[in-house]
């Protein structure tokens, strides 16, 4: 058997990992500006944490979850999304306690798992960046969180991003709309896809979310959920729209957007961008005011979003965005002869401890091959160290571009490499 990675997974090699690290660092910096702190939850949870919160009838639970019984006969699932585990942690760790400053703002970056057909930007193990804000029902929380995602896209240079907005209203509004949708779709049941016929019985709002051609045709003239919002829900949605306009964040109302998870209420949103003629969702989220209570905590409003790192990086690449990744090395040591081996290690380690990136040859290659490595690493400075240099206690360091060089004692290298670097690179 040829040993390979499982279908739908990937190896992220150093060249690509640098791009991932850059995007993650921009996200962390952005979230910290909004007073978010990082949370890390287990990669696997008890099955009920996901099934009950995400919804027993959702595609995630019925088709996509990786679940199994462990050796203690516990029903376990690999996390398919980030919100439910964070809410579970919020309740379990009593972050609702009065001594904890509200709202509680948390972000996460990590692997998620769904069994689905692998395709561009969609894998069975994928990586998600997400945020969750607990404790504020104020519509300004909705808008601030949406604005934070918008701010992140601006920082990354992503273009042509459109905010799609909708409201699912209160549970009462949603129930009234659910019945209206059933009444509308039932006469055309036979025209729906098999999946949507099932959804009509279990979760009719999900028919609106279908990508099947026959379903899209069926819901074209479906009633709008916005016509079923109660007074409080209407006021919340109007406030969200007003504040988005105040922040100059353009949006479009999309009444067919319902999101794929059952726990949302009031504001839901997606950021969509066009890539090679296709519309791709880059980020999505919304409000969930009942989820904390569902996990046994006090009734606590919540709002959050998630975005897929693979898809985000694919969009960055397709839009031709060059990420400012530092790839240069400060110094490369070419080593000649066994007599220089120990001193080379001593010098390169001393240089690193002064805050510089450094590498040396370990393979005993010819000098030409070592210089080629220095070029590959984009080394700014190159030093050649042989047995004669070790005996003299000094060596020549040269600027790898200008070829300017200077002879430097080992003592200076080990204690004041910053001055040497500045002298050669200025």
Swiss-Prot record:
SUPFAM superfamilies: Class II aaRS ABD-related, Class II aaRS and biotin synthetases. It comes from the Bacteria. It catalyses: tRNA(His) + L-histidine + ATP = L-histidyl-tRNA(His) + AMP + diphosphate + H(+). Keywords: Aminoacyl-tRNA synthetase, ATP-binding, Cytoplasm, Ligase, Nucleotide-binding, Protein biosynthesis. The keyword Nucleotide-binding applies. It is found in: Cytoplasm. CDD domains: HisRS-like_core, HisRS_anticodon. Pfam families: HGTP_anticodon, tRNA-synt_His. PROSITE patterns: AA_TRNA_LIGASE_II. The keyword DNA-binding does not apply. Its EC number is 6.1.1.21. One of its GO terms (cellular component) is cytoplasm. Homodimer. This is Histidine--tRNA ligase. It comes from Streptococcus pyogenes serotype M49 (strain NZ131).
